Amino acid sequence: MLHNNTAVPPLLEVSGISKQFSGVMVLKHIDFTLLPGQIHALLGGNGAGKSTLMKIIAGIEQPDKGSIKIDGNNVSHLNPTKAHQLGIYLIPQEPLLFPNLSVQENILFRLPKHQADKARMKHLLELLGCQLDLNANAGSLNVADQQLVEVMRGLIRNSNVLILDEPTASLTPAETERLFTQLRELQQQSVGIIFISHKIPEIHQLADQVSVMRDGGIALSGKTCDYTTDDIIRAITPAAKNKPLTDTEKRWSELNDNPQKTSSDLPVLTVTDLNGEGFRNITLSVKPGEILGLAGVVGAGRTELAETLYGLRPVLSGEIKLKQCPITRLKTVQRLKQGLVYLPEDRQSSGLFPDSSLSWNICSLTHNNRTFWVHPTYDATVVERYRQALNIKFSHINQPVKTLSGGNQQKILIAKCLEAHPAVLIIDEPTRGVDIAARNDIYQLIHNIAQQQVAIIFISSDLDEVVQMADRVLVMHQGEINGELTKQQIDVDTIMHIAFGEHKSQQAVSTIKTDKAASC
């Protein structure tokens, strides 16, 4: 790990950056510095503000307040082209390559002739110790090599600030180590690297400096060696309210004709040997009132499984039963009528009608049950019930849903799902992009829904969130269930080991316990 001289002028210096969307402060007076040859890790839960900060540095978003210095010079009105010219390159979590173009064509794409130097490109590859076939189609590369092509696109453009967003999310341990070797080579070339990750062991292995964001601010910042894993986890994890919902906030279950009133040991949903697009051999069950966590890295097949259960993707083989009745061949609308409801990950494109009113959105799943025509008086009653039950903040029921904050949009989506009378509710990344106050509201709401004997499948990439919420966890790895954890076994380290295929569940639990005992 490189030890930098603090007298060296920073490559990047961010001071007092603030930003708000729809009245919600997503960045609050952020200070952030990157030195030459430094790997500065950035961590934080979903909605902490990491992506917004990086988009501002890369010129994709404009700050409301604050200043940015690059190589000691103040810059303003950044856009992506200007950021590239100043040496800043953002490498997204999912590489954005042209799959039908060659590796060389992708690296040199849209470069002016004086920069499209093939000899220099080959020299950079040699410096990094890479063995890429420049003539191969980019679509034929594995994810690790695709990310390397993105790194090369930055370097060939003379970038000295590289921003890597969750670069190891879909990599095997061997691919991760190869990437780290190449990043250390870049350190020796005085390239500064912002490394966004939620994997704390990787941070200790790689980074010189660490900053943790929470609720739009910097909760911790300093030399990585000065902080333990527990220090970082405490900085990341939001402080839960641990306050039960009021009687008014529980009103949805009293008024909404909840179909499942009593507890039962019989599973309400059973899946047997299910195969589909992106997953295989899935067997699971969930009981009324149970929160079943579904964990795994990006690409593990969690969302594909959820969409298949809901009928959005085809079943290749296997069986799905809801309340002991086969639904494998039923269409989505039929599964919905039977009580299987899905709250999708992307609320903007899949869950909500952004330009439509609150009332239309909340009642949209049940309009066909009452004929397709809207009933304003009835809809107003429904909206008012959920306003009180979920503490939704809005001005008028005809207000377009896109004008609400992210947290209130998510509550509208939850209300829409509850109005469909779920027996099973599949929730995919429910707190992505919402602020800390709304996040804690949503945690409490999900617990309350489960208390009404609704079975919940809870999908989240935020492992602390999974630990906090789930009664039981299934961990997916490369499209299969790699392990099951009971409530007593659930912790972040164990989930991570299983999610990356290092251990099966029982082996992971015993290994983690041994490691913790040895460190005491």
Swiss-Prot record:
InterPro entries: AAA+_ATPase, ABC_carbohydrate_import_ATPase, ABC_transporter-like_ATP-bd, ABC_transporter-like_CS, P-loop_NTPase
UniProt key word Membrane: yes
PROSITE patterns according to UniProt: ABC_TRANSPORTER_1 (PS00211), ABC_TRANSPORTER_2 (PS50893)
Keyword vocabulary terms for this entry: ATP-binding, Cell inner membrane, Cell membrane, Membrane, Nucleotide-binding, Repeat, Translocase, Transport
Membrane topology note: Peripheral membrane protein
Protein purpose: Part of the ABC transporter complex LsrABCD involved in autoinducer 2 (AI-2) import. Responsible for energy coupling to the transport system.
Protein name in UniProt: Autoinducer 2 import ATP-binding protein LsrA
Species: Photorhabdus temperata
